[in-house]
Every structure is written in structure tokens, then in C-alpha cells.
Amino acid sequence: MRALVYERYGPPDQVLRLADVPRPEPGADEVLVRVHAASVNLWDWDQLAGTPLGRVLGPFKPRHKVLGADIAGVVEAVGEGVTAFRPGDPVFGDLSDGKWGGFAEYAVAKTGELARMPDGLGFIDAAAIPQAGALALQGLRRRPSLGAASAVLLNGAGGGVGTFALQMAKALQAHVTVVDRGEKRQALLALGADRFIDYREADFTADGQQYDLIVDVVAQHSPGRFAASLKDGGELVVIGGRIPTLLQVAALGGFVGRRRRQRLGLLIYKPSPADNLELAQRCAAGTLRPIIDGVYPLARGAEALARIGSGLAIGKVMISVAE
């Protein structure tokens, strides 16, 4: 089978290659999926480029030679003891708790990583959902009282997580401020954002505005600056960002906002087929939609990874595997 393979860290055009590799076989409680589509996440980029976060799984060389966690496809075969799925079932899911390997014609998944695709949902849209959509959903759930009177800020709003979170927050009638580079202004306003801030022109922690909830995908501010931008009782949910910021929020977030009943913390992502299915059903019903920046064939996978690494993508970057 064909797969995008890499054996050392570096730029995608230098280390990523399309190769013929043996097709994996499903073991007990596993399913072999013929991959139709896969999405590219920042976590793929981090592992490919060998950023400090990306080297957590492999300090000196890549742990997973074939990246790709979010997939959609059709069950080709099932392993021993599998009763939840059978060949021919359309499925999707996040393989990041298992073997990865989604940037290939076939991938092995644990049954607990997959859900059936709802009727009316295509493979590209299904593969776009898992990590980005579930992160957005889990982040907003930290503030169950969100509603028409709520002020929300999304930092790094133009990527996969942010474009999902923006739609979900607007569905709850919240007032949503988004922060990203100016090139994404029109797309985010068209998606429903009430206010746009270009981070290259203004610092959202310095304008005096305060929010009930801040969801930050690219956190770079100190806990004190975050706290000043939250209302009394407000909450900060950090999904990603610079390692020093992540460490500061993890260590100090529980103390910094205590006087004003604020909560500052990191979101510990939990891959969830149930969350993925809920989001997929919303997409199939037309109340939510994955924003697709572009679709690349498997042979141009290096371009897809480079697009994510550039920071210019609006929404999800996708790889179409099955022709």
C-alpha cells in the first residue's frame, strides 16, 4: 500500500516521502480501515518538524513513521473478537491514542477509536471532525452556562479548533471575539464572529475588555495577563501554545484567579468517539460544518503539512486518499 513515511525530523519537503509499505493487519479488538480521507492537525506538524512538543513521543527520532490520526473510510477487515463493526461499514475516528498511520491507504484502529459515519456525511467532512471538533466541544463544555449574555474570546480562531468553536459558541448566542492574523478577518466575520482582532496590531489582554470564557489555541501570555482579561468568575481554557506559557498556566492557574473566582487551566484532550459522533450528527443535519481550507491528494501530502505549518490555513487541511 502507499503511505506517507518519514524517518527523521525536518521540513516536509525534505523528510516526507510517498512509499510502498506492507499493509497492516488487524489484531484482536482492532479494525482495518481503507482510508478515504485524513485530516492534518498541528500535532502532525509538531511530530514531523520535531518541535519540543512533537519530540515528546520520540526525543531523537520519530516514534510513528506514518502520521495521521483523524481518518474516515470503510472497514476492510476486522480482528478477533470484533462485533461492533463489520466489513463495509463507513467509519471515522481519531487514532492518536493508538498507532496513528492515517496518511496511508489502510490504517489499523482500535474499535474504541471509531464511530459509524451518519448518513449524509462525506468522508472529507467526517475526517475533519475528530481532533479539532472534539477539542472545541470539550473546551466550550468547561463553561456550561454559555448563552446570550456570555462574552467569549477565541485566540487562534482561524484554524480547525477555532472555526468549530466559533460556530458552536454562536449557536449558543454568545458574543464572540476572535483573534488571528488579518488575512483571516473576512472568513471569520462571515462565519459569525462579532469582533475581530489582528494579533499583529493589537494585544487582546491590553485593551481593557473582559470575557466570561477565553479559549486559547496559541497561548503566549502570562497567567496574570489572562486573569486581567477575564470577568469575575471567568474561565481560561488553554488548548495549545508556547511551552513556557503552558507550564505557567499549569503551575499557577489555580492560584492567580482565585480571589476573583476565576479558573485558569489547560484542557487535557480526551479522544472520544461519542463526541465525534455528536459533532458528525450536527454536521449531517447542517447545523455545523467543517471549514475546509484545501484538499490534497496523498502524493501531495508534503504540501498539506507545509500548509498547516505556515499558519495560513483557515479551518482544516485535508488529504484525500482513496481515488
Model-derived segments and spans:
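C-terminal capping/lid region of NAD(P)-dependent oxidoreductase domains
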Residues: 287-291, 305-323
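Short glycine-centered segments of the SAM/dcSAM-binding site in methyltransferase folds
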Residues: 90, 151, 234-235
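Mid-domain Rossmann-like dinucleotide-binding core that forms the NAD(H)/NADP(H) cofactor-binding site
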Residues: 127-198
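Glycine-rich beta-strand-centered segment in the early N-terminal region that forms part
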Residues: 22-40, 52-98, 217
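NAD(P)H dinucleotide-binding glycine-rich loop of Rossmann-like/cofactor-binding domains
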Residues: 61, 69-70, 77, 84, ...
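Short glycine/proline-centered loop/turn elements that form peptide/ligand docking sites
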Residues: 80-81, 176-187, 220-223, 244-245
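A short acidic, Gly/Pro-enriched loop at the edge of an enzyme's catalytic core
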Residues: 205-213
